[in-house]
Design a protein with these regions (language model features):
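C-terminal or internal capping secondary-structure element at the end of a domain, subdomain, or sheet
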Residues: 114-154
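Positively charged n-region of N-terminal signal peptides that target proteins for export
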Residues: 1-4, 18
Length: 154
């Protein structure tokens, strides 16, 4: 019976996907469908704006929102809230794509927690962004940041 119970527990836990909340803190996403895990990350509050950034050898993801609240924010070319992916090229939700059909940058960030006791921020995000020409696009999906440290600069 003990072996059966052990097998059931092993099968249960082997099917669980990795949860970033167990890896305090962290910042990761899929960029064009490939894993992107930040080696360094931080958040900054300045002039009532929240900036969250992560970077690794493949590039930098930055998100800026004009609020310091737990809420959802749309990332669009006409919005004050925006996201950037930068490798050798600068991609932004402030840029729209061009073509026979207008391709618009779009995305969303959900701030799930601002922990003032630990001075950290957690949430999820996704966005599609274009380079300055509007011809090249990056798709950033399944983004999550967990307990990213906040630096306050007022």
């Amino acid at each position: 019976m003990k072996k059966f119970y052990l097998l059931v527990m092993l099968a249960t836990f082997s099917n669980c996907s990795e949860d970033l909340s167990n890896n305090t803190p962290g910042f990761e996403a899929l960029v064009n469908g490939k894993d992107w895990i930040a080696q360094s990350y931080n958040a900054t509050i300045q002039n009532n704006q929240l900036s969250i950034s992560g970077n690794n050898q493949l590039g930098t993801i930055s998100i800026v929102i004009d609020s310091i609240n737990v809420n959802s924010f749309e990332l669009r070319s006409w919005s004050d809230d925006f996201a950037v992916f930068q490798d050798t090229i600068y991609y932004s939700t402030k840029n729209d794509g061009i073509g026979s059909i207008a391709f618009l940058s779009a995305g969303r960030i959900d701030i799930n927690e601002i922990n003032y006791f630990e001075n950290s921020v957690s949430g999820h995000f996704y966005f599609e962004c274009y380079d300055n020409s509007g011809l090249h696009v990056k798709n950033v999906s399944e983004g999550v940041f967990y307990r990213v440290p906040i630096n306050t600069q007022d």
